[in-house]
């Protein structure tokens, strides 16, 4: 969305969240890291962001809601940002310990970010009618986008994986702002890839050519499965499928989601598990004796490297779960192999 507004000559500032949070300014290609205090990410940092927007005399801000807790989402929207265009990308099973326990609860929590007397962009899905009612209560115009109208030929123009959902949402934002579709489509093509963008890389091991996909940024099973399905549709040459699942001790709910909604639903030959609090994965894999399961919790990283190289033979290596901990090092290691 930032690149679309920039393409249309807006003085736009963008701010991303997550591990590699950045500031983007319309007048430079350089991206500036968000310097955080010792306590880490905090919605209070939004005050500094707004000050920078004002100082630069920008006329647009594209900003992710960094709050997960519903109460913090209310504060983020009503007190810190006051966005006049809200965007709800999807309702998925992530952070269920805070937003759940059901998807209906997640949808309800997201209503905190719907503006009053503004515009709301949502996807055409099972929650469209629910958000429509909430938008009407707040006198906000609803813009519903449909991923099925995005042509595959456009998606193939990017040098990284792009999903029709994302393109549809950005076109909805363009409509809300008043940017024509042609400008919006070109703006997306001109956009620098997000740090979490899914790229496909070849690497050699055991005298064979292997395919590597870093899907750590997806964070939850539904998006991860969508990425895997997309990769499989491209018919890359491989005879073996290796899943690397990296777990976090402070995200055991996320690990459980992958156990419940991913490991038993997708096809693979080998599961390599790294990180911490992997017990539930081990318990599940005891019910899958036909698959090779290797657990590296508590082991030296050099053992993980050797294990990956040993298994990579005409293989697709697909990384999922969390980038924190060994995840980032695993991605760097494989990306460094010719």
PLM-predicted stretches and their roles:
Residues 14-16, 87-88, 119-125, 242-245, ...:
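Short internal beta-strands
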Residues 77-83, 112-117, 234-237, 261-268:
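Short, conserved loop/helix-junction motifs that constitute active-site signature segments
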Residues 17-20, 125-128, 147, 275-279, ...:
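Short, polar loop motifs at secondary-structure junctions
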Residues 8, 82, 116, 138, ...:
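Short, structured coil segments at secondary-structure junctions
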Residues 2-107:
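ATP-dependent carboxylate-amine ligase catalytic core
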Residues 1, 176-179, 186-193, 197, ...:
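ATP-dependent carboxylate-amine ligase
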Residues 30, 153-165, 286, 305-315:
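Short, surface-exposed amphipathic charged segments that create phosphate/polyanion-binding patches used
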Residues 96, 100-107, 111, 118-222:
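Adenine nucleotide phosphate-binding catalytic loops in nucleotide-utilizing enzymes
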């Amino acid at each position: 969305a930032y690149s679309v507004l920039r393409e249309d000559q807006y003085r736009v500032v963008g701010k991303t969240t997550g591990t590699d949070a950045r500031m983007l300014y319309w007048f430079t290609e350089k991206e500036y890291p968000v310097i955080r205090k010792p306590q880490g990410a905090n919605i209070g940092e939004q005050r500094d962001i707004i000050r920078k927007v004002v100082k630069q005399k920008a006329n647009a801000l594209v900003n992710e809601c960094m709050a997960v807790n519903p109460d913090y989402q209310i504060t983020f929207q009503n007190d810190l940002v006051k966005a006049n265009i809200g965007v709800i990308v999807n309702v998925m099973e992530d952070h269920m310990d805070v937003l759940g326990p059901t998807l209906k609860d997640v949808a309800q929590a997201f209503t905190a970010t719907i503006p009053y007397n503004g515009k709301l962009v949502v996807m055409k899905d099972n929650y469209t009618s629910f958000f429509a009612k909430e938008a009407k209560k707040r006198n906000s115009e609803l813009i519903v986008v449909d991923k099925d109208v995005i042509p595959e030929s456009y998606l193939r123009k990017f040098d990284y994986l792009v999903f029709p959902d994302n393109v549809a949402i950005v076109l909805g934002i363009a409509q809300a702002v008043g940017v024509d579709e042609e400008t919006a489509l070109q703006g997306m093509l001109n956009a620098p890839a997000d740090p979490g963008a899914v790229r496909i890389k070849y690497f050699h091991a055991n005298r064979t050519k292997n395919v590597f996909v870093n899907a750590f940024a997806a964070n939850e099973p539904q998006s991860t499965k969508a990425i895997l399905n997309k990769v499989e549709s491209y018919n890359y040459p491989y005879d073996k499928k290796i899943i690397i699942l990296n777990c976090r001790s402070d995200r055991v709910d996320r690990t459980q989601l992958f156990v419940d909604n991913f490991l038993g639903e997708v096809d693979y030959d080998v599961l390599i598990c790294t990180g911490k609090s992997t017990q539930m994965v081990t318990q599940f894999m005891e019910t899958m004796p036909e698959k090779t399961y290797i657990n590296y919790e508590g082991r030296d990283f050099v053992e993980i490297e050797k294990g990956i190289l040993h298994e990579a033979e005409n293989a697709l290596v697909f990384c999922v779960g969390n980038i924190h901990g060994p995840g980032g090092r695993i991605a760097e290691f494989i990306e460094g192999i010719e």
